[in-house]
């Protein structure tokens, strides 16, 4: 491999690491900012109306977290697929 390929790989890896650290810090900020707000639903059906309607019963934190987790998982799966 040439030096440019190594540099390209290193910069791409650094980019994905930075993006994932930003995502984790965003989740950390949401949880600690609204830690008294989160209510774990006893049933899945209790959480689905919140996700489907977009209406948030417990302030803005939990809906943001519910909608953000699939994006984070998709990003992690993509980076694993790229580097394996």
Swiss-Prot record:
Predominant localisation class: membrane
Membrane topology qualifier: Single-pass membrane protein
Keywords associated with the record: Membrane, Transmembrane, Transmembrane helix
GO cellular component, one term: membrane
Annotated localization: Membrane
Designated name of the protein: Putative uncharacterized protein YPR012W
Segments traversing the membrane: 10-32
Protein species of origin: Saccharomyces cerevisiae (strain ATCC 204508 / S288c)
Superkingdom field: Eukaryota
């Amino acid at each position: 491999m040439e030096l440019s390929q190594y540099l390209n790989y290193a910069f791409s890896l650094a980019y994905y690491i930075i993006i994932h650290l930003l995502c984790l810090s965003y989740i950390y900020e949401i949880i600690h900012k609204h830690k008294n707000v989160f209510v774990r639903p006893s049933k899945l059906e209790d959480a689905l109306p919140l996700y489907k309607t977009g209406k948030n019963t417990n302030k803005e934190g939990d809906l943001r977290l519910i909608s953000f987790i699939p994006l984070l998982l998709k990003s992690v799966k993509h980076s694993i697929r790229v580097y394996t």
